Design a protein with these regions (language model features):
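The conserved beta1-alpha1 loop
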Residues: 283-285, 445
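Intrinsic disorder/low-complexity segments
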Residues: 516-546
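Conserved catalytic motifs of the protein kinase core domain
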Residues: 276-278, 357
C-alpha cells in the first residue's frame, strides 16, 4: 500500500511504476520509482521549494514519461524514455521566474507551450528530442496579445490547440505534414469546451465536450480531415426541456479604468428587461481560472421562476488571457472587486435587475470576492451567499503550516512583506467588516475542508454579527461531513443545491412561484427583507451555483 499518492505513470513494459506523493500540507513533492517485485522504492527527486508542486505522466505517444515541477508562475520539466525505466531523467528547461511551460511529444519533436521572454499569452514552439534546450526552440504559433494559447494536444498527424479570444474558446487544428491549419468555432454567444481524454495517438478524430448556458453537456467527435462534427451523446434533461424557451447573452460592463469586463447571462426567453426581474450574479476571479459558461439542469429551477443568472468574468480569472489574470492578483487584486461592482452597476443601469432583487454568490476565492464587495458596496445587493469562503486573507497567508499558503504567495503575496500586508489589509473581508448595514447573508462551510479551514468563515460570521447595524438575516451553516468541494454523494450534493436555491428564491420572493412560471415575472414580489440604504482558494473544485 502506498499512501498520499497524487499522480502515477507506468513504464512501457508495465514493470515499473513512477508515482508522486504529497507532504503534510497536501503538496505533491516526491517522485518515486517502484519496480514490481522489489522490496523497496527509490526516491528519484524531491521538490524542496514549497512554491512548487510535482506531477508525473506518460505522453499520448506512449514513448516518454514526463515529470513537471510547477508553481503559479514557473515550471520545470524532465523526461525519460518510457522503454528505459532505469535511465536518467533529462531536464527540458530549468525553472525561471515568470516562465511557465507545458510539454507534449510527437515524432522526433517535443511540442512546448511557453510564455517565456515576456510572451504572457503563450506561444507554441518545437524542440528536437535529442536536444530540447531553449536554444533549439523553433516557433510554430507566435504570441498574440489578444489570444491566449490555453492547451495543446499532439497526435501522430495533427495537433489541436485550444485558443481563447474575447473570452471564448476556439480550436485550431494543424496538419503536421503541411503546416496548414483551420479553426473550429461555435455559434452560441457564450459556451464552454473541454477536451475528452483522447488517448489514441494515431487518429484523425478529436473528441470534445461542448456545453453552454442553454445547451446540455454534449460529447462530439470532430474529424480533423473531413472537418465534421458528430454528436455522440447529449446529457438528457428530464421534464421535456426545450432550449428555445431560454435566452443567453454576452454583455460587457466598463470598469473604472476603462477595461471592458465580459458578462455571460441566461434567462427565460420571455423575461422582460424592465428592472423588475430577480437575478443571481456569480463570480470567481482568481488563479487565472476562467468561470465556465456551462449547463446546469438544476439551474432551470431558478430560470423557470423568473430568476436571471449572470456570470461576471472579472480580472484575476483567465477569461481574457494571462494579462487578465495578472491584472487581478498580487498588488492588482482590488480590480477583481471593482470589476464585479462595475458589472453590477451595468446590469442595474441596463434594467436587467434592481438592487432589491439581486443576490450574489461565490465559493472559495469567490467567497473572498463576495466578502470584499459587501464591504465596499453593500447597498447594491439584496442578499449574498458565501460558500467555503476565503475571508481571513491576512491571518491565513501568515500561517505557513496551512495547506496552500506558501504555494499561493505568487497569487496573493506574502504578508510578511509590509507592502503586501498593507494591500491585503485594504481588501480582506474579515479585516474590513465595519459598523454598517449589510444585506441578508448566508455563509456555508464544511468541517473537513482542508483548503479553507472551517474556523475562518466561523470567525467572519461572529465578527459580522457583532458589527453590522441592520436586522437582516445572517445564517451560518456548516456541513459536518463534507470537504472543500461539498458533499461527495450525488444525492447529498443535490440536497445542498436545493437548499441554496430555496434560500435564493425565498430572498427574491419567488419561493411560491411554480416552475412553470405561472406568476408574472415582470415585477418583484415584496422581498422578505427591505433593501438596505446608503450611498479557495483552489485545490478542490467548488461547484458553482449558477
Amino acid at each position: 500500500r502506498i499512501d498520499k499518492v497524487s499522480t502515477v505513470a507506468w513504464s512501457a513494459d508495465g514493470g515499473t511504476l513512477f508515482y508522486v506523493v504529497e507532504d503534510h500540507a497536501k503538496r505533491p513533492y516526491r517522485l518515486f520509482r517502484h519496480r514490481l517485485g522489489a522490496s523497496a522504492d527509490e526516491l528519484l527527486y524531491e521538490e524542496k521549494d514549497e512554491l512548487f508542486r510535482l506531477g508525473v505522466w506518460r505522453s499520448r505517444s506512449r514513448r516518454f514519461l514526463f515529470s513537471m515541477s510547477r508553481s503559479f508562475t514557473s515550471a520545470e520539466a524532465r523526461f525519460l524514455p518510457a522503454d528505459d525505466p532505469m535511465g536518467t531523467w533529462t531536464m527540458v528547461a530549468p525553472r525561471e521566474k515568470d516562465h511557465e511551460y507545458d510539454i507534449d511529444h510527437g515524432g522526433d519533436l517535443f511540442y512546448i507551450r511557453t510564455n517565456g521572454d515576456g510572451f504572457r499569452n503563450f506561444r507554441l514552439v518545437v524542440a528536437p528530442v535529442a536536444d530540447p534546450g531553449r536554444r533549439g526552440w523553433r516557433e510554430l504559433i507566435p504570441h498574440r496579445e489578444h489570444v491566449m494559447l490555453e492547451d495543446i494536444d499532439v497526435f501522430a498527424h495533427q495537433h489541436v490547440v485550444h485558443e481563447r479570444e474575447d473570452g471564448l474558446i476556439r480550436l485550431r487544428v494543424t496538419e503536421l505534414a503541411t503546416g496548414a491549419f483551420h479553426h473550429v468555432q461555435f455559434p452560441e454567444p457564450t459556451y464552454d469546451i473541454a477536451a475528452e481524454p483522447n488517448a489514441e495517438f494515431v487518429t484523425p478524430v478529436y473528441r470534445l465536450r461542448y456545453q453552454s448556458l442553454i445547451t446540455p453537456s454534449s460529447v462530439f467527435d470532430y474529424d480533423t480531415s473531413r472537418r465534421t462534427l458528430t454528436l455522440l451523446k447529449q446529457t438528457e434533461v428530464l421534464g421535456g426541456y426545450d432550449p428555445t424557451r431560454y435566452r443567453s447573452e454576452r454583455l460587457y460592463a466598463t470598469a473604472g479604468d476603462g477595461t471592458r469586463v465580459p458578462i455571460s447571462l441566461v434567462c427565460r426567453a420571455d423575461t422582460p428587461r424592465d428592472g423588475g426581474s430577480p437575478m443571481l450574479l456569480v463570480g470567481y476571479g482568481s488563479y487565472g481560472i476562467a468561470y465556465p459558461a456551462s449547463f446546469s439542469s438544476s439551474r432551470l429551477s431558478l430560470l423557470d421562476r423568473g430568476v436571471t443568472v449572470a456570470i461576471a468574468h472579472i480580472r484575476g480569472g483567465g477569461e481574457m488571457g494571462k494579462r487578465w489574470h495578472d491584472a487581478g492578483r498580487l498588488l492588482n487584486k482590488r480590480h477583481t472587486f471593482t470589476d464585479f461592482i462595475a458589472v453590477t452597476e451595468h446590469l442595474i443601469a441596463e434594467r436587467y435587475t434592481a438592487p432589491e432583487g439581486l443576490v450574489i454568490e461565490g465559493g472559495s476565492a469567490g467567497g473572498l470576492l463576495i466578502g470584499a464587495v459587501l464591504n465596499m458596496r453593500p447597498d447594491l445587493y439584496h442578499a449574498a451567499e458565501l460558500r467555503v469562503p476565503f475571508v481571513d486573507v491576512i491571518n491565513t497567508m501568515l500561517d505557513e503550516s496551512l495547506p496552500l499558503t506558501v504555494g499561493e504567495f505568487e497569487e496573493w503575496g506574502n504578508p510578511k512583506d509590509r507592502g503586501y500586508y498593507d494591500y491585503m489589509k485594504s481588501y480582506c473581508p474579515y479585516t474590513n467588516l465595519g459598523p454598517r448595514p449589510y444585506p441578508t447573508i448566508l455563509v456555508r462551510t464544511s468541517l473537513n475542508d482542508s483548503q479553507v479551514m472551517y474556523w475562518e468563515p466561523a470567525k467572519y460570521v461572529a465578527r459580522l454579527r457583532t458589527l453590522k447595524t441592520d436586522d437582516n438575516l445572517l445564517l451560518f451553516k456548516i456541513d459536518m461531513g463534507a470537504g472543500h468541494g461539498g458533499p461527495s454523494g450525488r444525492y447529498d450534493a443535490l440536497h445542498e443545491t436545493a437548499f441554496d436555491y430555496a434560500w435564493i428564491l425565498t430572498r427574491v420572493g419567488r419561493a411560491t412561484t411554480s416552475a412553470n412560471g405561472s406568476e408574472r415575472h415582470g415585477e418583484l414580489r415584496a422581498p422578505p427583507n427591505p433593501p438596505i440604504g446608503g450611498s479557495g482558494r483552489p485545490g478542490g473544485a467548488v461547484a458553482p451555483l449558477g
